[in-house]
């Protein structure tokens, strides 16, 4: 069996890689926008084309060999965009391997360690009342873990990823706002639901430590991405000075970066993204590094149902999975239209599938309804005109 074609498919803000073979077996994976969060994601698409030059004509079942070639043939390494391409292609190759073997991917990774995968979902409410109401609804639906962005009443149709409001807050109001929002959710759901916050790498270490300490009474499961991702000494400092576990890793993409994070004691949970950090092959290795240090894995999953499917197979096969991020709209709207059927969910868990490969297929006929559009975030401009992290 040989690879005959590697192509990128786009619909709405989502991108996929499809790998075709001369045996008629195809595999799919989800492509992260990488550096494309500021506009058209042409760099990860170019990364796919770069990897396709190597992969076309090769046996798709030799996944580790191909992973190493795609990673190392770029002499100065490819950064996030090439790693995103490798990650999507890797998912597709595992999909092919599972289909060829007639087995679900997790069976090829050592077999299942669990029958279902615990989820956390994000609360998108803009006011404290909205957050409390949504939290109650999610708990009623069966979720036992919830995450929120702890700043701002947004207004203007902005999402938590855009973070509008934080840039206008003083050091003191930042803490007060976080306490008000987290307290509203904790009061709504009671003491036994796990709560997390995500500040999307937007705080300074001083701000992160102050916010973390202010939230100590609310017993957070973890504090996700408090500061910018590059300086591991700073991560170790923050982790040592906040009263809850720190989770980090969605903007890292190599085993070496995660090893550095762990060596600096910068996180108790790592959050690699299968569509950014080299796919199933690489994240299985990241999880092993974490396991050797008694660190949990909480895979990042901000995209659509194909990435969710890949995450489920990884979570099934990896012992030290703590919890899996889950976009609540995975099984509705545009995301539902783009696939034949999403992973089966029962309350706050996804059921490990029995079907060969990843167990999900694209509904390419639906792509015509959803023309590609760029994924953008507005810059956060502080009152003095300076830039805060996007």
Whereabouts are the PLM-identified features?
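Structured beta-strand/loop patches that form or line metal/cofactor-binding pockets in enzymes
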Residues: 1-28, 32-36, 329-337, 390
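N-terminal amphipathic alpha-helix/helix-capping segment at the start of soluble metabolic enzymes
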Residues: 1-10, 16, 98-99, 103-116, ...
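Shared catalytic-loop signature of beta/alpha-barrel
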Residues: 20, 37, 46-53, 65, ...
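Metal- or metallocofactor-binding catalytic centers and their adjacent structured scaffolds
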Residues: 20-100
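Metal-dependent enolase-superfamily TIM-barrel catalytic cores that perform enediolate-based chemistry
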Residues: 116-237, 241
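Extended hydrophobic packing segments that form well-structured cores
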Residues: 358-390
């Amino acid at each position: 069996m040989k690879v005959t074609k590697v192509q990128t498919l786009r619909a709405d803000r989502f991108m996929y890689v499809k790998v075709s073979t001369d045996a008629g077996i195809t595999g799919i994976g989800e492509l992260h926008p990488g550096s494309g969060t500021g506009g058209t994601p042409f760099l990860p698409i170019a990364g796919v084309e770069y990897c396709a030059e190597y992969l076309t004509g090769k046996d798709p079942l030799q996944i580790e060999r191909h992973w190493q070639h795609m990673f190392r043939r770029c002499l100065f390494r490819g950064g996030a965009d090439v790693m995103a391409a490798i990650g999507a292609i890797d998912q597709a190759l595992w999909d092919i391997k599972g289909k060829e073997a007639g087995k679900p991917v997790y069976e090829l990774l050592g077999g299942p360690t669990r029958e279902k995968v615990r989820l956390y979902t994000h609360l998108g409410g803009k006011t404290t009342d909205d957050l409390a109401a949504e939290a109650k609804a999610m708990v009623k639906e069966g979720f036992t873990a919830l995450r929120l962005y702890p700043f701002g009443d947004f207004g203007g149709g902005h999402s938590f990823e855009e973070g509008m409001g934080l840039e206008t807050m003083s050091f003191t109001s930042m803490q007060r706002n976080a306490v008000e929002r987290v307290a509203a959710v904790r009061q709504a759901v009671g003491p036994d639901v796990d709560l997390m916050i995500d500040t999307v790498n937007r705080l300074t270490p001083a701000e992160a430590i102050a916010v973390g300490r202010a939230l100590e009474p609310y017993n957070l499961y973890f504090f996700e991405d408090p500061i910018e991702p590059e300086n591991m000494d700073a991560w170790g400092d923050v982790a040592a000075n906040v009263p809850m576990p720190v989770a980090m890793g969605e903007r890292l993409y190599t085993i070496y970066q995660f090893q550095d994070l762990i060596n600096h004691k910068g996180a108790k949970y790592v959050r690699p993204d299968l569509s950014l950090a080299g796919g199933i092959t690489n994240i299985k290795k990241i999880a092993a590094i974490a396991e050797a240090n008694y660190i949990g894995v909480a895979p990042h999953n901000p995209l659509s149902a194909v990435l969710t499917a890949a995450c489920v197979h990884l979570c099934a096969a990896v012992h030290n999975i703590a919890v899996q991020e889950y976009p609540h709209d995975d099984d509705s709207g545009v995301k539902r239209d783009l696939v034949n059927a999403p992973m089966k969910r029962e309350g706050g868990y996804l059921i490990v599938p029995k079907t060969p490969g990843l167990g999900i297929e694209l509904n390419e006929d639906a792509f015509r309804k959803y023309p590609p559009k760029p994924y953008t975030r507005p810059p956060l401009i502080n009152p003095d005109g300076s830039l805060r992290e996007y």
